[in-house]
Amino acid sequence: MMNETGMAAAPAEAAWRIWQAPRQQTAFRQLMTAFSYPGRVVPLADGAESALLLVLTTLVDSACALADPLHALSSDDLRRLGVRSASVEAAEFVLADGNRLLEATPRLGSLENPEQGATVVMRVSRFGEGPHLRLTGPGIQHEQVLQVSGIDPGWWKQRSEWNAHFPLGVDLILVSGHEVAVLPRTTHINLKGAH
């Protein structure tokens, strides 16, 4: 990555870009692509950027509550985000690790306000490895296959229970390294034949 002098940007400078509006606007467009094409792996971050942190700097602000049961964010990052800390049950955004199930149910929204269901931002090991998830639903022409490793199989049962009464439910943003894939609550996951 080059800075305005044409020199390669230092890692600290590259990491700082995620706090700036132009980078967040680009990331927002990339995230909207991921939401529009469920299960498609989309490159989000580059260089020294953290895709997990870039998702948060792009989508959350001081009006949002964030649950970080992983303690994945530093106190400096939390301060810069300006979010309120909340429990998993009360937060609009929940950080999760694919290897550990949540011990509480995130917000599912209501019939009057289904958009108040939480967005779970989940760290996973890797895309392109692991079980084949066969996805169908809005934004998917016939079927999309997503391979992802580092997710406890119990997550799919939890997600199914949370999203059983559409339009209530949660949306998942899976994050691995510099890439993301989104599983909106409208996406159906078929694990049969997963290998």
UniProtKB/Swiss-Prot annotation:
Pfam families: PhnH. Gene3D superfamilies: Bacterial phosphonate metabolism protein PhnH. Belongs to the PhnH family. Belongs to an operon involved in hypophosphite oxidation. Exact function not known. The gene is htxG. InterPro entries: PhnH-like_sp (IPR038058), Phosphonate_metab_PhnH (IPR008772). Coiled coil: none annotated. This is Putative C-P lyase subunit protein HtxG. GO terms for biological process: organic phosphonate metabolic process.
